[in-house]
Amino acid sequence: MNTFAQAQFMTDVNGRPVKELKYTDIDGSPYLREDWSAGLIKTQSGKLQQFARVRYDAFQDELEYDQAGKYFRLAPEISEFSCGDGTFRNGFPVIDNHTKDSFYQILYDGKTKVLKKIMIRVITEKAYGSATETKRFLKEEKLYLAINGILQAIKGDKKAIILIFQDKKEALETFIKNQKLKLSSEDDLLKVAEKYDSL
């Protein structure tokens, strides 16, 4: 048990013990969205299962479901899930501090994939002139491109993004110029990925 969570042992759908984590002394929420929503999960074997109430714990990078008022963590055999926050998938190459089990939100799902990694971490703060420390959850997001089985982090400037698409650089530069894309928004990036797949 860590210093900021109390664990209760429960059983998941496969009969294995799992921990329901209750964060007691941290401000904010570990969930991407506090509300529950209907969800659909896909296992590694391709089996689909629907749940009436799920939510994504981005701090633990796990999906939680509610069954008759009891909370359960879904087993690691899950490869994909969809809920009110979008569609999330794992199985991508290891990058940064993320593993093959890490879930990414799928923003564009063509031959090229645009992914968003949503991370929630705990930070400790001390108010000026105070000896008291407080902990709170902080949400961070990072965009990635998956091209030909390679995962690459997306940096904010146009030149760095064009370098990722180097094999079709000239056509994309023309497209970006004609469309007046600044590549500073997710929408612009999705348009470029879609164009890349069409070339």
Label the predicted regions:
Residues 30-32, 39-153:
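Aromatic-patch recognition
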Residues 2-5, 26, 136-139:
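Short acidic/polar alpha-helix capping motifs at helix-coil junctions
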Residues 1-9, 192:
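Bacterial Sec-dependent N-terminal signal peptides
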Residues 6-44, 50:
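Positively charged
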Residues 198-199:
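Short, solvent-exposed mixed-charge patches
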Residues 122-191:
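A short, solvent-exposed beta-edge/loop patch
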